[in-house]
């Protein structure tokens, strides 16, 4: 059976992710207590089910301690088990809670009346939740949903599901350093040393996906050399990542604004590796 467990920080999009899996044909259960996972799998097998997706959150934190053992047991029974851990930067989470007017699951007492106290209390809840789920984050594939719209997250989850038959999925992601390094990055490369198309008025409104920007960077020796170095590094160490039984490898490429140079490098890397590997692309500041 193909089993996907979605967990992570409150407000990071677990419900959206679970709905995407439901749309992909998975039998889904929301907020399943970890202690019931084995029984649910057994029940699905009796019903001849082939897929299962469950979400778990911090409200089951006390039971999550035994989850690694449960996952190991399921894998020993021949099941294909994947864990997706959704997270986001604290500012993004605060904004989402403000938009939805929902309370954090760990807010056991009411917020103070002034907005500063409310923000501080919510921040403390998020920090506490991160600490409680740290052990689970280590065993899952981390997806940073900061700034990611719901439709993009649905597409992202769909891409991951479609990669289930591939031993390793490479996620190439562009980003802007001024907005922070992606939380889900395994490898991070800085391409801010390359000539910046931003200073060319004709190229400024374009992105690294546009031909004029690509033509500009392809004529820059440093861009060609840096691209070759990054490509060579990933190519050299890819077998080691595969041998480590990883399901996903996230390669993050950063520049100043996340619009030109990092986007160009990501597109070139994806084009190079796509014929032989399962590749996904995300341009964080453009999507």
UniProtKB/Swiss-Prot annotation:
* Alphabetized Pfam families for the sequence: PapZ_C (PF22740), RapZ-like_N (PF03668)
List positions binding GTP: 57-60
Name the domain of life this protein comes from. Bacteria
| One annotated GO molecular function | GTP binding
- Any idea which positions bind ATP? 8-15
Per UniProt, which keywords does this protein have? ATP-binding, GTP-binding, Nucleotide-binding
Function in brief: Displays ATPase and GTPase activities.
The family line of this record is:
Belongs to the RapZ-like family.
Write the protein's name: Nucleotide-binding protein HEAR2885
